[in-house]
């Protein structure tokens, strides 16, 4: 969860404030300058507005963070007051991110309850994230595949 530590300051620009906070923490832990640079660079480049897989660690972080969609992320218990983000997350009853045995494809496999949210709603919210996942996978010399309800979409 270190990558989102900047959210304690504000959601806006949390990647940059988080990178600064992580620098202090890692420096106080006597991490090597090379490790600190790699980690804070990944943290500073993981948010949608500024994300870019500048190194393999950043690419892995982007894949993990942007593919994190699941019902348990929704804290609001009143389904009648859900916004589209709540609906999309709540609709995901199963989520799995995996790499094939040949290490050529990273696949995000989702099961979505279409009574709660349509696949189109998912794309309305997460298309940008899926594009970032594809770029991150490419940085790791992988192809990104998205499968929703058994249908390969990317």
Identify the residue ranges that each predicted region occupies.
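Terminal helices and disordered tails flanking the catalytic cores of nucleotide-processing hydrolases
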Residues: 71-154
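Divalent metal-dependent catalytic cores for phosphoryl transfer on phosphate-bearing substrates
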Residues: 1-99
């Amino acid at each position: 969860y270190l990558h989102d530590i900047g959210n304690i300051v504000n959601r806006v620009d949390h990647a940059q404030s988080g990178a600064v906070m992580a620098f202090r923490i890692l420096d106080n832990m006597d991490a090597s300058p090379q490790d600190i640079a790699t980690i804070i660079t990944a943290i500073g480049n993981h948010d949608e507005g500024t994300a870019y897989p500048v190194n393999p660690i950043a690419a892995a972080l982007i894949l993990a963070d942007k593919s994190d969609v699941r019902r348990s992320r929704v804290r609001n218990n009143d389904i009648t007051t859900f916004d589209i983000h709540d609906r999309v997350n709540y609709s995901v009853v199963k989520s799995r991110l995996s790499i094939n045995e040949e290490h050529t494809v990273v696949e995000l496999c989702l099961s979505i309850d279409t009574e709660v949210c349509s696949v189109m709603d998912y794309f309305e919210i997460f298309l940008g994230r899926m594009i970032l996942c594809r770029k991150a996978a490419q940085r790791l010399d992988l192809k990104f595949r998205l499968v929703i309800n058994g249908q390969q979409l990317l």
